[in-house]
Amino acid sequence: MKTHFDTATAKQRRDEILDTFLRMMERASKEQVRAVLIAGDLYDKRNVTKRVRSAVLGCIAKYPDMQVYYLKGNHDHAGAEEAGDAKIPENLHFFGEDWSEYVLDDSGRRKVMLYGAELSKENSQKLHESLYVAQDDINIVMLHGQTTKYMQGGKAETVALDRLKNRGIDYLALGHVHAHAEEALDKRGVWVYPGCLEGRGFDECGVHGFMLLDVDTEKGKVEREFIPFASRTLHEFPVDVSGCSDANEVFDRVYSAWEKAAIPDSDLVKLILTGEVSEGCDPDPGLLTQQFGDKVYFLKVRDKTSEAIDTDRIAGEKSVRGAYVRMILADKKSSEEEKKALIRTGILALAGEWDRLEESWEKQREAD
């Protein structure tokens, strides 16, 4: 999840991520939200500063009429209940390894109930079957884990969907996956990963935000809407520069793709160069960083190109490398991609071009 920020930029991003949580709470208050559900990974790091913890707890206490329900995740090494010198707000509620239940609303025709439990190795195999809810209530269930169709032995953070179907769940609120995703659980309910409020690294690209639920206690319906809310968006931006013969042609190819993409200047971008370039072409990631770096908040350039090899020409040679290429091409067990990699490695090794060989391996490691 690292993005290799300099110190000042890293601090600014940490502040922005904290601010997004504070803004979300303010938005919830303005929307007259009665309950905020946090399904884990609130801090998502081992060491949480006193400043951050105080800001989070202080923000929750600022809205006493809005109840906050916090279920710890696998990345919450220091949970909100470990407040240090700070006082736990009365409107902040927690869960244990057995099912906890809270009444969110009992003023209408149907009660709105919240159930939640923290998954562990000790309870993961039996927790799903021990959930009992009233079928006439509107039931929200909160868990933190990876969804699977069926229970998998030995894995604590497993949400076995087959064991939660047809149990009266209207909305299954999940944490653990940091991207928004949702599907039908059964004919009655849905399961939803709202994702995290902000993407922190380039493994968390795309739109981030939160889910806003509108519960109709008369009709027994839960309407949901995903609200994009992140201050910045992260993008993986691949550009095929196949056939380019020098850095100028690479620039032109990237510039054309960049103009079409219309990426906001407030966002973070990982530019990935792909394809086969002409022999001797250096795409020059450092130069591209200088040329495009001022177009966005943060830019990282990764060169995953390879030099084109005229396999047919080399295979026709009466030489050691020609014999090597013919041998690889005749291999019926290897895929075309594997053959390309073997041919490239062999040709560079036979030519004694160890620097280029190491560079090729480095690109492959980055690609993997």
Map each language-model feature to its residues.
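Alpha-helix termination/capping residues and helix-transition junctions
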Residues: 30, 62-65, 166, 263-265, ...
